[in-house]
Amino acid sequence: AVEMAKYYSLSGADELCMLDINASYQNRKTFIKTVESIAKVINIPLTVGGGVSNLSDITDLLNAGADKVSINSAAVKNPKLIRQASLRHGSQCIVVAIDGKRHKDKMKVVIKGGREITKNELINWAKKAQSLGAGEILMTSMDTDGVQNGFDSNMLKKVTSNVSIPVIASGGVGSLEHF
């Protein structure tokens, strides 16, 4: 992970996002030592997420060298965490990762790496995350993630037209043409 991060940084990436997507599902924390090692060898912003369940986890990751912390499942289960984190550390370093999935003709929020469909509707959750203090949204369409046929443009347009904070597109890229 450290060598890949260094490679991306030296190759011109303008930001690096390291997500341990199985951490929440496996009920474990993100590897702090890896974050520390990566932060030492790159010169671009580093966003870290996965297994973040409370304010202490966010503080630990920022202290380890992360510039931003991404929260997903914990934010859905405890939305107040977004407010607490943004008040303590500033909204500029709080990224709410949202995994969206089409379910029964609606766009729903899923958690635990896409394994659990919640009752939250995607657009409502994005608006709520912003109102609670998220500085960015990392939007992943679970319908296109891993397929490599391009982003879910429809889902992204609906989210970006309903919030004013930056939305990072994730899930579906297979070639440069998808950008």
Spell out what each predicted region is.
Residues 1, 29-36, 79, 118-123, ...:
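Charged helix-capping and loop-helix junction motifs
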Residues 13-34, 73, 138-150:
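Glycine-rich, proline-tolerant flexible connector loops at the mouths of alpha/beta enzymes
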Residues 62, 66-139, 143-145:
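Conserved anion-binding
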Residues 1-9:
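Short catalytic helix/loop segments, enriched in acidic residues and glycine
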Residues 39-69, 154-179:
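Catalytic cores of alpha/beta
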Residues 8, 16, 48, 61, ...:
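Conserved, mostly hydrophobic/aromatic
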Residues 13-14, 43, 66, 134:
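A structural motif
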